[in-house]
C-alpha cells in the first residue's frame, strides 16, 4: 500500500495505539453483541494464526487479547475499545478451520460470523490473517467468499512473516494476489507482519487511521 505508509498516518497510528486499549465485551451469540459505536475493524483467521498476538502487538499490551496454544479456544467475538476520541474498536473473531472441533461447534461459529458480517453497519473492514509460512488454505478461500457475499471490505495480512525465507514469502504474496484478483471485496494490497519483531505494525496501524479518515470518524 502507498498512502498507508505516509509518515503522518504512521505517527497518528502510533499515538492512537499508544493510548488506553481495553477489553469491553465478549459475545457468544449475535443477540449479545454490544451496541454499535464508532468504527469497527475485525480480525479473522484460522485457529492459531496469531490473531491475539497481533492485537497485543498492535496495542503494545502483551495480555490485552488472551493467547492460547489450544486451537479453537476463542469461540466468541471479543471487542476492544481504544482511546475515546479515536472512535476505533477492534474485534477478535473466532478462529476457524480447527479440525478437532465438533460439527455443532463449527456450525455455531459459522452462523455467528455470518450474522455479524451481514448486520454490523459499523464494521468498516475485516483483516484476514494468513500464516505466512503456509499461505492461503481452502478454508481461507471459504471465508473470502463469505466476505464477498457480505460486501464487507477486507484485506489480507500475513502473520509470522519473519519465519519465512524472503523468496518463499514473495512466491506466496504473488500467489495470493492472483487469488485476490477474483474477489471483488478484497483490498488489492497485502500487509506483512510479525508480532514477534513488530514488523508491519506501523503500516497496519496507519491503514486503520486512513480507514477512520475515509469514514469521517
UniProtKB/Swiss-Prot annotation:
GO terms for molecular function: GTP binding; metal ion binding. GO terms for cellular component: cytosol. Its cofactor is Mg(2+). Keywords: Cell cycle, Cell division, GTP-binding, Magnesium, Metal-binding, Nucleotide-binding, Septation. Residues 37-214 form the EngB-type G domain. One of its GO terms (biological process) is division septum assembly. Mg(2+) binds at residues 52, 74. It holds the Pfam family MMR_HSR1. GTP binds at residues 45-52, 72-76, 92-95, 159-162, 193-195. Necessary for normal cell division and for the maintenance of normal septation. Belongs to the TRAFAC class TrmE-Era-EngA-EngB-Septin-like GTPase superfamily. EngB GTPase family. This is Probable GTP-binding protein EngB.
